[in-house]
A protein has these predicted regions:
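Phosphate/pyrophosphate-binding loops at sites that engage ATP/ADP/AMP, CoA/4′-phosphopantetheine
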Residues: 102-113
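Short, well-ordered amphipathic alpha-helical segments that serve as non-catalytic structural scaffolds
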Residues: 90-104
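N-terminal presequence-like segments and the immediate start of the first folded domain
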Residues: 2-93, 121-169
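Acidic helix-start/capping segments at beta-turn-to-alpha-helix junctions
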Residues: 113-122
Length: 169
């Protein structure tokens, strides 16, 4: 199974969970992925990692903004160094820097992050991840779920996605 298939399955499962919790979307994930819909539909803004509108060919957008909320897709640390040098702290710092960048692209700040999902390849890495995670939220962190998973794309030790509010100006 390739990364795109894995992420597509995750997106569909995550959408099902959100639906079960009463969170609705303006466009179904299946329709959005299959239709090649334009980057802006029903007030939905889809941005790439440079903050520019995404292409119709992009399957996964790192930033989606809708009704004052910023959805940041899962960010992983795809480390190319020797595995012996990998630490949960270095991976978490890499991921949180990406999260911060994407939240800011969407018009938010780390103080406006409402919720985060953390995926760890080893639950034993929770302490190291949490220590780094906490440094990004000096005024208190968001609601957070942390789960251990069998593997993550690109051999990342951690992947994080989040939802933030657009900051008031």
């Amino acid at each position: 199974m390739n990364i795109v298939s894995t992420r597509r399955m995750f997106a569909l499962r995550f959408a099902s969970v959100l639906s079960a919790l009463g969170v609705t979307t303006a466009i179904s994930p299946t329709r959005a992925m299959a239709s090649g819909s334009p980057p802006q539909e029903n007030g939905i803004r889809k941005l790439n990692s440079e903050g520019k509108p995404g292409s119709e060919k992009d399957v996964i957008m790192p930033v989606v903004i809708h009704k004052g909320l910023i959805y940041v897709s899962g960010q992983g640390a795809h480390d190319t160094r020797d595995q012996k040098e990998w630490t949960i702290e270095s991976h978490t710092t890499n991921v949180m820097d990406k999260i911060k960048k994407h939240v800011e692209i969407g018009g938010g700040t780390m103080d406006t992050v409402l919720q985060a999902n953390v995926f760890l390849t080893k639950i034993e890495n929770w302490d190291g991840m949490h220590k780094v995670f906490a440094t990004y939220f000096p005024h208190g962190g968001p609601a957070r779920t942390t789960v251990a998973v069998a593997a993550l794309p690109g051999d990342s030790l951690v992947e994080i996605n989040c939802i933030a509010a657009v900051a008031k100006k």
